[in-house]
């Protein structure tokens, strides 16, 4: 891969993808049960063996298109292997954030994690720790009163969706305050990567950090060009965080001078903006429309002389707003062409959540055959991946990937 001056270089949604972050599906999926899956934001239980096969097809398409893949577990391992003191700090922080409250259990977990190889320790932190795995473990009164029984540390099945815990914007990142409690521990990995990894430490500005008051998730963060962002206000991202991100980007004198905030319904089906809206070519977007799907659009700009943000509400249609701020006519391909039945089915299965690997070239779930055919009829090259198991977590190819480097366009 050609060298870039910065380890993060994302100034578009569609520039040729050069480097991306993924997570291989692991034993955390095997620890989902019918009784807890809803709490962990899954609508069904994936079959791990097939999920891995499907994910490998995804990774193979990326590799065949000369995309360098980083795996989040490998980056964390590269951080921790450098220092025993850092390993101990990471273990202690992880246990603290898992809300383990008794000294006895804390010490058992420290001993347990320290006894594993670094790679196995990271895998176990993601997959969760059950009571039988800790020798001499006994439930405390606090455990019994608060219903702790099966897991001492809960699994993190949503690590599969690397898009959300942090997001690349320009040459920096947001390390996000996740909306749901079950996902908040995921961002500890990003914290350590950007603080301690030799490639990323001191080289990547942090626009927002994981301890912010308001939530922000990467599925709501879209980079359209060097001056323009689109941020979703959704079920998972709050308006406060959008404004705070704008302040950070503007005051740090980045190239971004305009943010379009798209407010969408707070609905499980539309949890992030990228579940209903993504860019797939220079002037082509895909979107989902239904009776309850609407976009309220706000524009945030900065006045350097007064150091104030100006916010206004746009009254024009989304197509006209995008055309104005991009300076060219744009087209929107609707999920299944707007068909009420196929459109709803295919949006639910991430028909709009596609990953652009180059202008006019995307990776999509094969099951969304009506939408995929429309893409191809409109000149878009579609790489299809199987998704009978991956789709059970309500995330598509864009959700399962965090671009680190794209070619500028």
UniProtKB/Swiss-Prot annotation:
The active site is at residue 399. Pathway: Amino-acid degradation; L-arginine degradation via ADI pathway; carbamoyl phosphate from L-arginine: step 1/2. InterPro entries: Arg_deiminase. It catalyses: L-arginine + H2O = L-citrulline + NH4(+). GO terms for biological process: arginine catabolic process to ornithine; arginine deiminase pathway. Its EC number is 3.5.3.6. It is an enzyme of class 3 (hydrolase). One of its GO terms (molecular function) is arginine deiminase activity. GO terms for cellular component: cytoplasm. It is found in: Cytoplasm. The keyword Transcription regulation does not apply. Keywords: Arginine metabolism, Cytoplasm, Hydrolase. Belongs to the arginine deiminase family. PANTHER family: ARGININE DEIMINASE (PTHR47271:SF2). This is Arginine deiminase. The gene is arcA.
């Amino acid at each position: 891969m050609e060298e870039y001056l910065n380890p993060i270089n994302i100034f578009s949604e569609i520039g040729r993808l050069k480097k991306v972050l993924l997570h291989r599906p692991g034993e955390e999926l095997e620890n989902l049960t019918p009784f807890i899956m809803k709490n962990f934001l899954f609508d069904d239980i994936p079959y791990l063996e097939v999920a891995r096969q499907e994910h490998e097809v995804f990774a193979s398409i990326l590799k065949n298109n000369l995309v360098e893949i980083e795996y989040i577990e490998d980056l964390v391992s590269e951080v921790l292997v450098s220092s025993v003191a850092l390993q101990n700090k990471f273990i202690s922080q992880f246990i603290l954030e898992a809300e383990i409250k008794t000294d006895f259990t804390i010490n058992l977990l420290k001993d347990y994690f320290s006894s594993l190889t670094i790679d196995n320790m990271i895998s176990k932190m993601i997959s969760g720790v059950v009571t039988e795995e800790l020798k001499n473990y006994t439930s405390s009164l606090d455990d019994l009163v608060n219903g702790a029984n099966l897991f001492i540390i809960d699994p993190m099945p949503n690590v599969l969706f690397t898009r959300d815990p942090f997001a690349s914007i320009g040459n920096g990142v947001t390390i996000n305050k996740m909306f749901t409690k079950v996902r908040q521990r995921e961002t500890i990995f990003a914290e350590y990567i950007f603080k301690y990894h030799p490639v990323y430490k001191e080289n990547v500005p942090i626009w927002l950090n994981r301890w912010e008051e308001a939530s922000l998730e990467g599925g709501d963060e879209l980079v359209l060009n060097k001056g323009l962002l689109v941020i979703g206000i959704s079920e998972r991202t709050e308006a406060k965080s959008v404004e705070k991100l704008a302040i950070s980007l503007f005051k740090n004198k980045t190239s971004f001078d305009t943010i379009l905030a798209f407010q969408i319904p707070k609905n499980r089906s539309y949890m992030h903006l990228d579940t209903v809206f993504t860019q797939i070519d220079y002037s082509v977007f895909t979107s989902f429309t239904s009776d309850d799907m609407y976009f309220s659009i706000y524009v945030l700009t900065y006045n350097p002389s007064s150091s104030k943000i100006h916010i206004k509400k746009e009254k024009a249609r989304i197509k006209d707003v995008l055309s104005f701020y991009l300076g060219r006519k744009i087209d929107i391909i609707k999920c299944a062409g707007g068909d009420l039945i196929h459109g709803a089915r295919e949006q639910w299965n991430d028909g709009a959540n596609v990953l652009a690997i180059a202008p006019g070239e995307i990776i999509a779930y094969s099951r969304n055959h009506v939408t995929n055919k429309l893409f191809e009829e409109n000149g878009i090259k579609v790489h299809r991946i199987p998704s009978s198991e991956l789709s059970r977590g309500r995330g598509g190819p864009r959700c399962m990937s965090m671009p680190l480097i794209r070619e500028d366009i």
